[in-house]
Design a protein with these regions (language model features):
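C-terminal compact regulatory domains
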Residues: 1-127
Length: 127
């Protein structure tokens, strides 16, 4: 995942630090959003194709990950429809996976995040 530009949406400071460290340790470039609305705004203002993947927490204040993903997917630009969006959540039940798919998310990673799995899922998503 070296050289990838990743939008990381996470409201918990410790989780953000851990995820950011894991990603930067693998050579990725990380832009942080602290809630769903911020993630949508950062993506909307970015150049088309600027981000390679979005890591989206589900439970966030202001706007949750499901709503944020739906808004990103509805933007009038090509990359909004195809950018991989990976849910990161403590809720790893089948029902949550279905909700993530319905919102337009491509993958689902359970917290606490396993670094090797995270890298594998990102790599497979952008491949």
């Amino acid at each position: 995942i070296k050289g990838l530009h990743i939008l990381l949406a996470e409201d918990n400071e410790l989780n953000m630090e851990i995820a950011e460290f894991m990603l930067q340790n693998e050579g990725a470039d990380v832009v942080k959003a602290w809630n769903g609305r911020e993630a949508v705004e950062i993506f909307r203002k970015s150049e088309p194709g600027e981000f390679d993947v979005i890591l989206m927490d589900i439970m966030m204040p202001v706007m949750n990950g499901y709503e944020a993903t739906k808004m990103i997917r509805s933007l009038e630009r090509e990359d909004a429809k195809v950018i991989p969006v990976i849910a990161m959540t403590a809720n790893a039940f089948t029902e949550d996976r279905l909700k993530a798919k319905e919102a337009g998310m491509d993958e689902h990673i359970a917290k606490p995040v396993d670094p090797k799995l995270l890298v594998k899922v990102i790599y497979e998503s952008v491949d």
